[in-house]
């Protein structure tokens, strides 16, 4: 199957740039809804730091030689903003040495693709709350990550090139059980496929469904694609099960496609 390269560019445009105003709205909404309870965990030794990182899908650690610099208070505020991220902070030499820290730095540890993303001293020097919030938003990828334009930017910035989308309404009675199974399936493809939820109940997500030529009547459905290639496929499903998701993913990775998109032509391609 061959789809033109322009279609890959259209996909990235639809996912990342199609709803730019909402990116700002996401940050503002999260900032407005800060919790006053969560604080970073003070890490005084290596075992505690290792344990925190290992137990979290996403962990952000502030390694600071100087706790008086302005970014420290900004960092602490992030822990109140991102409730699904584990935050730690340390200025202990043993911890800094273990992680090869030679200057103030912030590191995001991510389980789903076993990645470590660093903001070094030079980055931190010009960092403010908005920039740090965006860094965490973009890279906050979990076993299952809910789609947003900002998250899409992170998806296209990862080493994992195959992404699976589950398109269904979060208000569906089957949502909770479907997500449990979807998450279970995601763990089978760590480092191979990133799993994403697209809430089809949001009108603004209609462009994502249109790109994959899916109608409301076909949902829930799976859509899978490679971010740097021309391969993609879809599978409407009446019920989300681990077996169905695993079979669809394994088939795609082996080059087995459910639909012949070449035969469909480019009639469904959107020029945005």
From Swiss-Prot:
<dbReference type="Pfam" id="PF13848">
    <property type="entry name" value="Thioredoxin_6"/>
</dbReference>
<feature type="domain" description="Thioredoxin">
    <location>
        <begin position="39"/>
        <end position="152"/>
    </location>
</feature>
<keyword id="KW-0732">Signal</keyword>
<keyword id="KW-0325">Glycoprotein</keyword>
<feature type="glycosylation site" description="N-linked (GlcNAc...) asparagine">
    <location>
        <position position="100"/>
    </location>
</feature>
<keyword id="KW-0256">Endoplasmic reticulum</keyword>
<protein>
    <recommendedName>
        <fullName>Endoplasmic reticulum resident protein 27</fullName>
    </recommendedName>
</protein>
<dbReference type="GO" id="GO:0005788">
    <property type="term" value="C:endoplasmic reticulum lumen"/>
</dbReference>
<dbReference type="GO" id="GO:0006986">
    <property type="term" value="P:response to unfolded protein"/>
</dbReference>
<comment type="similarity">
    <text>Belongs to the protein disulfide isomerase family.</text>
</comment>
<comment type="subunit">
    <text>Interacts with PDIA3.</text>
</comment>
<dbReference type="InterPro" id="IPR036249">
    <property type="entry name" value="Thioredoxin-like_sf"/>
</dbReference>
<comment type="function">
    <text>Specifically binds unfolded proteins and may recruit protein disulfide isomerase PDIA3 to unfolded substrates. Binds protein substrates via a hydrophobic pocket in the C-terminal domain. May play a role in the unfolded stress response.</text>
</comment>
<feature type="glycosylation site" description="N-linked (GlcNAc...) asparagine">
    <location>
        <position position="91"/>
    </location>
</feature>
<keyword id="KW-0834">Unfolded protein response</keyword>
<feature type="region of interest" description="PDIA3-binding site">
    <location>
        <begin position="230"/>
        <end position="233"/>
    </location>
</feature>
<feature type="short sequence motif" description="Prevents secretion from ER">
    <location>
        <begin position="269"/>
        <end position="272"/>
    </location>
</feature>
<feature type="signal peptide">
    <location>
        <begin position="1"/>
        <end position="25"/>
    </location>
</feature>
């Amino acid at each position: 199957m061959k789809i033109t390269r322009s279609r890959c560019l259209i996909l990235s445009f639809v996912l990342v740039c199609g709803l730019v105003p909402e990116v700002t709205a996401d940050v503002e909404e999260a900032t407005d809804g800060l919790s006053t309870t969560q604080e970073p965990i003070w890490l005084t030794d290596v075992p505690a730091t290792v344990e925190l990182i290992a137990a979290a899908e996403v962990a952000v650690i502030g390694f600071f030689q100087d706790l008086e610099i302005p970014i420290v208070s900004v960092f602490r505020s992030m822990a109140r903003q991102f409730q699904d991220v584990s935050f730690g902070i340390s200025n202990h030499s043993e911890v800094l040495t273990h992680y090869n820290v030679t200057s103030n730095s912030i590191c995001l540890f991510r389980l789903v693709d076993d990645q470590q993303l660093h903001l070094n001293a030079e980055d931190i020097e010009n960092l403010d709350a908005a920039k740090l919030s965006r860094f965490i938003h973009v890279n906050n990828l979990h076993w299952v990550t809910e789609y947003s334009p900002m998250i899409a930017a992170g998806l296209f910035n990862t080493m994992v090139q195959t992404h699976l989308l589950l398109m269904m309404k979060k208000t569906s009675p089957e949502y909770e059980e479907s997500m449990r199974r979807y998450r279970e399936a995601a763990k089978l493809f760590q480092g191979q496929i990133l799993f994403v939820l697209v809430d089809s109940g949001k009108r603004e997500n209609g462009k994502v469904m249109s790109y994959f030529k899916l109608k409301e009547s076909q949902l829930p459905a799976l859509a899978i694609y490679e971010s740097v290639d021309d391969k993609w496929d879809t599978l409407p499903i009446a019920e989300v099960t681990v077996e169905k998701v695993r079979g669809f993913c394994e088939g795609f990775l082996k080059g087995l496609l459910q639909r012949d998109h070449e035969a469909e032509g480019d009639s469904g391609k959107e020029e945005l």
